[in-house]
Amino acid sequence: MLMIISPAKTLDYTSPLAIQRYTQPQMLAQAETLMQTVRTLTPAQLGSLMKISDKLAGLNAARFTEWQPSFTPENARQAILAFKGDVYTGLQAETFSEQDFDFAQRHLCMLSGLYGVLRPLDLMMPYRLEMGTRLHTPYGNDLYAFWGDSITRQINQQLLQQGDRVVVNLASDEYFKAVRPAALEGELIKPIFMDEKNGSMKVISFYAKKARGMMSRFIIQARLREPEQLKAFDLEGYAFAGETQGRQGRELLFTRRHSAISPAR
C-alpha cells in the first residue's frame, strides 16, 4: 500500500541524520519551472501571498534566491527528516531502522507545493510554499492548476513500482486536493481519527495530525500490505470504531476516549 501524507511548515536542517543514503526528487523539472515564478516576487509580495510575517517573508525570499537544483547532502536534507510538524512527531522517522527507511521509501510519499511528490529519502532544499497558495503561473491562478494531473500520474507510477493498488490517504484536505481520486489506479482508503471532547467524538486538529503520522509509522514498522490490517491500529489509545463508504472511497474511523490521552500530551 502507498501512504500519502502532507509536508510541514517547520523544518529541521541541524539535527543528526538517522540515515546517510539519499535520492533525488522525481519532479525536479517542475519545481525548477515553479521557482522561476516564485523568484520574481519581492519579500513584501511573498508576505502578502502567503499571509506570513515580514521576518518569515524575508527568510523565504532568501531561500528562493539560494535554491538551485543540484541537491547534495551539503545543501539539502532527506525530506522525511527535514519536515518537523505534528504529523512528523507521530511518525518519528528519526528512530527508523535501515529496513524501516527501505519500506518507507517504497510505500510512503509526501505531497509538496514546490516539489509535487517527495519520497522519504529525496533530498530537498528548505522552502515554504503551501499547496493552497494562490500563486499565478502560466498554468493558472493557483498551485492546483500548476500541478494539474501530474501529481496523480506520479502517484500512479509509485503504485506500479511498489506492487499493489491501495492508496492510504493520510494527507490534509488542502494537499489531497492536488490529487485526482477518480484517476488513481488503486483503491482509496482514508483513516479518520476522532477524540472525545465535551462528551462527544470530534476531529481535533493537533491530535488528528499526530495520529496520521502514527498510522504511517504503524504501517511502516509492521510492514503492512493489506487494508484490513489497518484496523489493528491501537497506538496511544486509539481503537477502530467502524467503516463507512465516503465520497472518494472507504473511510476507517478510529476513536479515542479522553481518559486514554496522557496528561503529558
Curated annotation (Swiss-Prot):
Alphabetized Pfam families for the sequence: H2O2_YaaD
Entry's family note: Belongs to the UPF0246 family.
GO biological process, one term: response to hydroperoxide
Organism, scientific name: Edwardsiella ictaluri (strain 93-146)
HAMAP family the UniProt entry points to: UPF0246 (MF_00652)
GO cellular component, one term: cytosol
Protein name: UPF0246 protein NT01EI_0662
